[in-house]
A protein has these predicted regions:
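Short, well-ordered beta-strand segments in beta-rich or mixed alpha/beta enzyme
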Residues: 2-9, 38-64
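Short, surface-exposed ligand-recognition loops at beta-strand->loop->(often short) alpha-helix junctions
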Residues: 8-19
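An amphipathic, aromatic/His-enriched active-site/gating alpha helix that lines ligand/cofactor pockets
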Residues: 21-36, 51-84
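Short, low-order "capping/linker" segments at domain edges
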Residues: 85-90
Length: 90
């Protein structure tokens, strides 16, 4: 499954982005990290799109107290959306 995540930030985008980059090994265990997209929407919002996500593993990672502690000073809220590719009209 492909997932788009809106990340509401407590910190600056730059501080959060460094944390995000440093966590690529953990992310690679739940998705195709080579396809991950990340960007700054505004000063307090980041956007992340991940592909080929193992949803059970993602849920376990986000519920992990270690992950929550790591992100608590950076992230106010993660808002995930599932993505479905559109089939072009014939």
């Amino acid at each position: 499954m492909d997932v788009h995540i809106i990340v509401k930030l407590k910190s600056s985008f730059e501080a959060w982005h460094q944390l995000f980059l440093n966590d690529s090994d953990r992310r690679s265990q739940i998705c195709d990290e080579s396809r991950t997209l990340v960007g700054k929407a505004n000063e307090k919002t980041a956007i992340v799109t991940v592909f080929g996500v193992n949803m059970e593993a993602m849920g376990a990672m986000m519920a992990d107290p270690e992950f929550q502690k790591m992100t608590e000073n950076y992230v106010e809220e993660h808002i995930p959306y599932s993505l479905t590719p559109l089939i072009p009209p014939s």
